Structures are given as structure tokens and as C-alpha cells.
Amino acid sequence: MGLMPDFLSLCHEFPWTFLLVVIFSFMIFKVTKTHLVNKSKKYKLPPGPKPWPIVGNLPEMLANRPATIWIHKLMKEMNTEIACIRLANTIVIPVTCPTIACEFLKKHDASFASRPKIMSTDIASDGFITTVLVPYGEQWKKMKRVLVNNLLSPQKHQWLLGKRNEEADNLMFYIYNKCCKDVNDGPGLVNIRIAAQHYGGNVFRKLIFNSRYFGKVMEDGGPGFEEVEHINATFTILKYVYAFSISDFVPFLRRLDLDGHRSKIMKAMRIMRKYHDPIIDDRIKQWNDGLKTVEEDLLDVLIKLKDANNKPLLTLKELKAQIIELAIEMVDNPSNAFEWALAEMINQPELLKRATEELDNVVGKERLVQESDIPKLQFVKACAREALRLHPMEYFNVPHLCMNDTMVGDYLFPKGTQVLLSRVALGRNPKFWTDPLKFNPERHLKEGIDVVLTEPDLRFISFTTGRRSCPGVALGTTMTVMLFARMLHGFSWSPPPDVSSIDLVPSKDDLFLAKPLLLVAKPRLAAELYRTNEI
């Protein structure tokens, strides 16, 4: 693997970084030496690259950025579906096999239900006071109860139907205006990534703040400067949460921000707070002054929650932090899945034809597709499910932390072990999927069985499973399927005139398409169906 040359070249390129690492390593050497020796004797761990003394495999990780791609390449070279990578004093266990994944999240779920405390999640959760990013404990239990019982319950899901419909209608209005507007690149050219991401952002703002815009209302239904800045900040946080920062494994280096992750996340969080906090503060004042008496959105719901003593259940800090986390969780899967799926379907036009035929048969062309139509849209849902399988948003799920020494299969994992389930490799494992790299929605269709976007057997990860499963399955499923259904029912899609097919190549740093998908849209329905006056 050329370990020594990579290590030496990295030392030459970043000598001051490695000097600090070495200094810190020797500081902790006396404390950790005996512990590490005993640990290696006591625990039986999966195969992995031979670690360097003290720093483990940190040199390889730093020499092969991004680490997510390096880990997958390493496991392929080792021909293993579970590995052990030592990053300083942290044991990281990546998993690419659904059967092994179920051992962790189903059979031994109680032992692996926590989260590691690292720099990025500390910042994104404002000190671990939210839900998804928070270690197992009383704070997590409190905030999860709030989500499950008060924000994402079936009753609240139905209560918010009208707001979701408004944003689905606005999506149609926005794309229709793009079709009718003469632009430099010609009428109808749509950036699918922008449209899909801002649909998610609009749904978030409408459900939480009962408004589509932070700033000026845009006449075409599209995003303004404020909405663009907000959604970009959201995806920046997503990018750097669990991005294998060196300070996560050598905490002494956190404030030095050697890889720049800390400053990027903090800047994105400042942008989020810039838009959220004034609205939240003003809304609380309205309730306190008696100017508001009726709950209209989820912010109102959070403000009015009371504890057993009739005091506010959430502190202001908890409320604000949880709203930021909701923004992060609501925008990721739908937009990326749709962009990839539509690109795949353009290259396989028979799939696009079948999806639109199903929509026409179920809905017709005299009205817009609604959430009540979703149970009948089996092929459309199969397209969404296949996109989540083949084209996940991230390489790995949120890490699971081992809370006590646990035996899984033939291995004994020590407390503090981090387990990473590979969203990419689970969904593309050839032992579980025939022709796994082919986009084939048909594989999910079975007579008499409803197509769902969840996958409890972890053959791919959409909403995960176990104690740390996503409580927003209904909302996430609805947003994803409605994005697919409205865009496919309302418009016909084709490549620009100078493009014969879509290049299905991911970015070198993440799992987005390397180039945003640009397609020509043409309305399929009567003009009056695209009009909306809602803001």
C-alpha cells in the first residue's frame, strides 16, 4: 500500500501538524501504553491495517483524504466486510455487509445506541442538547420524546398537510415559470439540484416558521439570496458532520483547526442562527405579550410545550438548537435521491415513460398529484427507493458508539468503539443485490406488497433502524415521494440540445453528481394547474 512513502511525504508537506501530533502522542504515551497493550490482548477485533505506535492509522487517513473513500478502498483491498481501523486511541469499525450491520443495530442495538462526542457534532448540536447527534442519555430521551410525541406524530403530520401542499404547489409554480421564461440558455432549462434542495428548504421553513421566505418574496416562486445562503449553510454542516477531522481523534488539536472543519461549521451555524434567532425571539415575545394565541406551526408547538410544573419544557438554547438540527435532517435525502434518479431515468427513458404513465393512470391530467395518491404510486415509490439504495447522500451513517464491552459474532468490541455502517456498500453489496450498480426500480416491485422507503434489514440505509432510527420516517417519505411525483407528473424532462446522455459520475469529494443536473422542462398539464398565490 506504500504506507511509508505516503507517511514521509505527508510529514514533509505538513511538518508542523505532525510535530504537534507527535508531541501530544508522547504526552499521552505513559497513560495509554499499558491500556493499549492490555486492550490488544483482551479484545478480539476484525482485520485492519497495521497501526503505527500511538497515532494508529492517522497518517494513512491524513494522506488519503477524503477518509470515507480511503476506508472503502482499504476494505476492498483487504477483501473484508468488516474492518478495524485505529485512529489514535479510537477504534473505528466500518461495516459493508447487511447481515453484520443487523448484528449491531438489531441484535445488539442496546449496546451501540450512543454517539461519539466529537468537534463537529458538538458545534452542530450546540453542546449535545438536540436529538440525532447526541449521546445516549437523559437529554437524548427528552428530546426524542419531543420529536416523537409533539412534532412528528401522525396527528401533527396530518395537521401540517396543508403547508406541505403549499410547497408542493409552489414547486410546480417555480418550474413552470422557468419553462415560460426566456433565459440565456433557452426556456425551460432547470437546475434540478437547486430546485430539489430548495423544495426541501421551503418545506422546512413553512412547517417550522409558517413562511417560505426569510427575505423578499420572489415573484417566480424561487429562492432569494437569504434562502440560498440558508440552504448552502445547511449542506455545509451536513458535509462536515463526521468528516473525519484530525481533532476528533487528537482532541488537543481542536482549537488549532488544522483541517479547517471547525471554522467552516461555525460559519455555517452563524448563518443559520442569523435567520432563525430573530424569528424565534420575536415569536416567543408574541406569545408572552398575548399577541399570539393559536398554534400555527411547529415553532409555536415547541414554544408552548410545558413540563410537569407548567414551565417551558425546553430552554431557549434547546429550542434553537433543535430547530437547526431539524433543518439539517429535512433536506438531505429527498434532493440528492431525486437528482440522481432523474439522471438515471433520462438515460433509461423507458423508466421515465413508465413513471409518467403510472401517474397519468392514477391521477389523470386534470388535477395535481396529492399525498393521498401515494399508496397507489408503486413504481414512482420504487424509483425513489432505488435511488436511496444506489445513490445515498453520505458514505456512512451517523456513527454508533459502543457503550460497554460487547461480543458481536466472533469479535469482542471494547467500550468506546465507533461503528460505521457504509450506506454505499450496503446498498451495492452483490451478495444481496443482483447487478447492484444498475438503476433498476423493478427489483423493488413484488405482487401484493406495498413499496416503502424504509429497509429494516439494512440492505441499504434510508432512515436506519433500532433505538437511533429516524423518528421522521413519515415526513421524509412524504417529502421524497411528493418531490418525485410532482416533478414527473407536471413536466416532461429532456437533456439540453447539445447533450445526448447524462454522465453519471459522482463528485470526487462526495456523492453528489459531479455536475449539477441541468434539464429542459416542458409542462404536461393545463396552465391553470401551475398557478399559486401562496407565499
From Swiss-Prot:
GO terms for MF: heme binding; iron ion binding; isoleucine N-monooxygenase (oxime forming) activity; monooxygenase activity; valine N-monooxygenase (oxime forming) activity
One of the GO biological process terms: cyanogenic glycoside biosynthetic process
Summary of the tissues where the protein is detected: Exclusively expressed in aerial parts. Highest expression in the apical leaves. Also detected in the second leaf from the top and in the stem. Not expressed in older leaves or roots.
EC identifiers of the protein: 1.14.14.39, 1.14.14.38
Catalytic activity: L-isoleucine + 2 reduced [NADPH--hemoprotein reductase] + 2 O2 = (1E,2S)-2-methylbutanal oxime + 2 oxidized [NADPH--hemoprotein reductase] + CO2 + 3 H2O + 2 H(+); L-isoleucine + reduced [NADPH--hemoprotein reductase] + O2 = N-hydroxy-L-isoleucine + oxidized [NADPH--hemoprotein reductase] + H2O + 2 H(+); N-hydroxy-L-isoleucine + reduced [NADPH--hemoprotein reductase] + O2 = N,N-dihydroxy-L-isoleucine + oxidized [NADPH--hemoprotein reductase] + H2O + H(+); L-valine + 2 reduced [NADPH--hemoprotein reductase] + 2 O2 = (E)-2-methylpropanal oxime + 2 oxidized [NADPH--hemoprotein reductase] + CO2 + 3 H2O + 2 H(+)
Localization (cell): Microsome membrane
Cofactor field: heme
Residues bound to heme: C470
Superkingdom to which the source organism belongs: Eukaryota
One Pfam family from the record: p450
Keyword Ligase carried by entry: no
SUPFAM superfamilies: Cytochrome P450
Topological region Cytoplasmic: 1-8
Keywords: Endoplasmic reticulum, Glycoprotein, Heme, Iron, Membrane, Metal-binding, Microsome, Monooxygenase, Oxidoreductase, Signal-anchor, Transmembrane, Transmembrane helix
Pathways involved: Secondary metabolite biosynthesis
Membrane-topology descriptor: Single-pass type II membrane protein
Glycosylation sites: N38, N232, N404
Side of membrane Lumenal, spans: 30-535
Major site of localization recorded for this protein: membrane
UniProt cross-references to PANTHER family, sorted A to Z: CYTOCHROME P450 98A9, OS09G0441700 PROTEIN
UniProt similarity note: Belongs to the cytochrome P450 family.
Miscellaneous remark of the record: Unlike in cassava, neither cyanogenic glucosides nor nitrile glucosides seem to be transported over long distances within the plant.
Protein function: Involved in the biosynthesis of the cyanogenic glucosides linamarin and lotaustralin and of the nitirle glucosides rhodiocyanoside A and D. Can use L-isoleucine > L-valine as substrate, but not L-leucine, L-phenylalanine or L-tyrosine.
Identification of the protein by name: Isoleucine N-monooxygenase 1
Source organism per UniProt: Lotus japonicus (Lotus corniculatus var. japonicus)
Gene symbol of the encoding locus: CYP79D3
